[in-house]
Amino acid sequence: MRIKTLLAGAVAAFALTGPALAQDVAITGGQVLTGTSVVENGTVVIRNGKVVSVGTGAAPAGMRVIDARGKVVTPGFVAVDSGLGGTEVGSVRGSNDLSNSANTLTAAFDLSYGLDPWSFTLPVARLGGVTRAVVTPRHAGSRAGHSHDDSDFAGAGDGGYQTPGLFAGQAAVIKLGGTDILVKSKVAMTAPFGEAGAAVAGGARGAEFVLFKETLAEVRAFARNKAAYDRADMRALSLSRADLEALIPVAEGRMPLIVTVNRASDIQQVLRLSREEGVKVILDGAAEGWLVANEIAAANVPVLLHPITNLPSNFEMRAARMQNAAALNAAGVVIAIKGNEGSAHRARDIRYNAGNAVSHGLPFAAAIQAITVNPARIFGFDGQFGELKAGAAGDVVVWSGDPLEPFSQPSAVLIDGVEQPLQGRNLLLRDRYRTGGEGAMPPAYGR
């Protein structure tokens, strides 16, 4: 009987992510928030998995129609700094493929090989309107600057981690539908700065910045002299060949570096480092970013933030406040709002966090952009998803009401034009064990 139950669960899990064919479909009659504008009584037409038009005309003859009258239509949300597809049960090391504790492979760590399209976290995130995600590796040596749900990295090693390197590895972009979820690997490098980075470098911020500059110098020397390196005809370098190769695009300014940093003075140092070394950076966290908002804007550096961070949980967040998102946006900084930081299970919180940012001064339109078009643009996917426009992916969510209101729910979720099941393991368990009345036993008890 237990085997039958397990098999049934496996079949149900596959049904939540199984492959399907894109359909030509028109979504009509709703208020369409394209990501950059609003179309009342709009029609979104999708063919072959792509948006072909957004306007107010009638649906093409013979096309399947989703009636969105009285509803709100948005692009699928884009979760950033997420663990979706890379971790299942945070306290179980074997189900976590987001971090690598070996100091022999740091920058070259590519989490895309460990992504699981059958992860139970993906359908739950889809129920929150998330259709794409930037999955970022976690630095194995420090939790500073992050608050992970479900003790994401507790018990992750026998006797603790090895001393990790400066870099956590390379991020990937995924879609939350189908069995081939990888959109692109190696979209960004990740590294902790501030308290977390200081811990890696020996305990002081000054050591980390010197170490980072020295690392870039080694990478550039390697890039110029690969033949000499192979002949062992140059000085010994501190990183493995794989790590050196992985960092060449960062040193050349072609791959962005996601820097976890929160203290205002640390942000200033990161901006200076970016300027001096020609490194393209993305600030992750920036809890005190509002103090230096004009400097961030002048440097044209985007920010990934958790807008409800408002407690001085450590000495690099003494000035954290819930108006951070509004202040950064007002200064002209491109922001992307996160779900719970580093989370797989609470990536769906992205819309709640955007709503909280609105309640603390962020304009509604800017909040929608911060969970749709902005993250797509930050990671180099402008016009490809996160926006309802001709040529973009057919990632669309139809909402019962304001998508930033907790009580609004999706009535349809499409990814690449494929309508997704509005179901998740959490809801399957709810339905299975729903009593149906006082005194009634759950179905499994009668088996």
Where are the predicted features?
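Gram-negative bacterial Sec-dependent N-terminal signal peptides
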Residues: 1-21
